[in-house]
Amino acid sequence: MKEYKTPSYEETVKLGERVAKSLPKGSVVAFLGGLGMGKTAFTTGFAKGLGIDVDVSSPTFAICNTYIGEENTLYHFDMYRVDGWDDLYSTGFFDFLETDAYMAIEWSENVYGALPEDTLMIEIERISENERLFKMYKKSEEEE
């Protein structure tokens, strides 16, 4: 497990950018953390690290936002309202796993059983109003 502290929104964005640049195509990142923890800020940087220059917003109502760059695609999911396998199938989640696109998944605890074993799990904890602690590990390493 790797841990990173970010003192501000801007540093959270930069962390997301660095992580994106370190991952191979087709990678899945899954966030664990409540409202206002920095999931969308991290995803903003993640998109930037993939060369996708867009305004990232939480896909709360759309369930999935798609961001397309010249070389990479990012599917940004919010699984908060997903309740069961039927709901998950209707999002296109499993189809997107078969592509070389990147996926960022908010509220991943709701779809934990469907996440690939090599998913990068990112637990976010609030230290103070602006400071966050990010704990990162592969899903397959959780049981160890």
State where each predicted segment sits.
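N-terminal pre-Walker A segment at the start of P-loop NTPase domains
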Residues: 1-18
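Short hydrophobic/aromatic beta-strand immediately N-terminal to the Walker A/P-loop
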Residues: 28-30
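Short beta-strand-centered segment that lines the nucleotide-binding/catalytic pocket of NTP-utilizing
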Residues: 52-67
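Phosphate-binding P-loop
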Residues: 20-25
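Short phosphate-coordinating micro-motif centered on Lys-Gly-acidic
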Residues: 2-3, 48, 86, 94-144
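P-loop (Walker A) phosphate-binding loop of NTP-binding proteins
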Residues: 32-34
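Conserved lysine of the Walker
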Residues: 39
